[in-house]
Curated annotation (Swiss-Prot):
Lineage per the UniProt record: Bacteria, Pseudomonadati, Pseudomonadota, Gammaproteobacteria, Enterobacterales
Keywords: Lyase, Menaquinone biosynthesis
Assembly and binders: Monomer.
Function of the molecule: Catalyzes a proton abstraction reaction that results in 2,5-elimination of pyruvate from 2-succinyl-5-enolpyruvyl-6-hydroxy-3-cyclohexene-1-carboxylate (SEPHCHC) and the formation of 2-succinyl-6-hydroxy-2,4-cyclohexadiene-1-carboxylate (SHCHC).
Protein's name according to its UniProt entry: 2-succinyl-6-hydroxy-2,4-cyclohexadiene-1-carboxylate synthase
Class of enzymatic activity (EC top level): lyase
């Protein structure tokens, strides 16, 4: 079973917000944003290999989707929104397309890739993620994290935010992170764009104004896009006030 943390009880008649963190994160990642949505009950999940779910094994997207469903059932949650960042966003998209749909009210994605349509691209990405996984298993975590956050997708991080992320992520277990990275590699994820376009529930993708790559990915996938100003890939960290405002607006007016 996945470890969880109830961030707030909210109002009993509202659906729950289920918060899914990115790779290397934990249930604390969404705390600031959830606090700006106090009307909604909020449950943050530790994904396999992370936080208090460090010993939980995950072998595939189907696996984590089933684990999420079991976790919601354990908590008696019948109506919910999924909110996911990066890896958490990809998991949320997969769950919405291939998981148990009962009770899902909508999906809010931050910087999540809907998938690669080209098989050759998927093979390249799987090799890329496998190489990173080997580094997480074999090298000192501090060194791997320092290199991880120098990747182009994180180019807009300020030095302060980059150092803070490295510090916060340093208590991860490298081997557990590696296992989850391989199990949920973008190279093993199907292209979800066609199904996401036909979802029976509302969906939106939030991207930082400076995250041009993921803005284009979202447009190419034909998905609804909203821009968070003064932010890059990790827009909920860079501009929490604006991110929370966009999220709240969509929850209230999902059409």
């Amino acid at each position: 079973m996945l470890a969880t943390k109830v961030l707030q009880q909210g109002e009993a008649d509202r659906p729950w917000l289920i918060w899914l963190h990115g790779l290397l994160g934990n249930n604390n990642e969404w705390r600031v944003i959830a606090s700006r949505c106090p009307e909604w009950p909020s449950l943050a999940i530790d994904l396999p290999g992370h936080g208090d779910s460090v010993a939980v094994v995950c072998t595939s997207f189907d696996d984590i989707s089933a684990q999420i469903s079991a976790t919601l059932q354990m908590h008696g949650i019948e109506r919910y929104w999924l909110v996911g960042y990066s890896l958490g966003g990809r998991i949320a998209m997969y769950h919405a397309c291939h998981g148990e749909p009962r009770g899902l009210q909508g999906v809010i994605i931050e910087g999540g890739n809907p998938g690669l349509a080209d098989a050759a691209q998927r093979e390249l990405r799987l090799a890329h993620d496998t190489a990173w996984a080997e580094r997480f298993r074999r090298e000192p975590l501090a060194q791997v994290l320092a290199d991880w956050y120098q990747q182009p997708v994180f180019a807009n991080l300020s030095a302060v935010h980059r150092d803070a992320l490295i510090d916060a992520r340093s208590d991860n277990a490298g081997a557990a992170v590696a296992d989850m990275l391989e199990a949920t590699s973008l190279g093993t994820q199907p292209c979800l764009a066609p199904q996401l376009q036909q979802l029976a529930v509302p969906l939106v993708v939030l991207c930082g104004a400076d995250d041009h790559k993921f803005q284009q990915l979202t447009r190419d996938a034909g998905l609804p896009l909203r821009i968070v100003p003064q932010a890059g890939h990790n827009s909920h960290l860079a501009n929490p006030q604006a991110f929370a405002a966009e999220l709240r607006n969509f929850l209230v007016n999902p059409g």
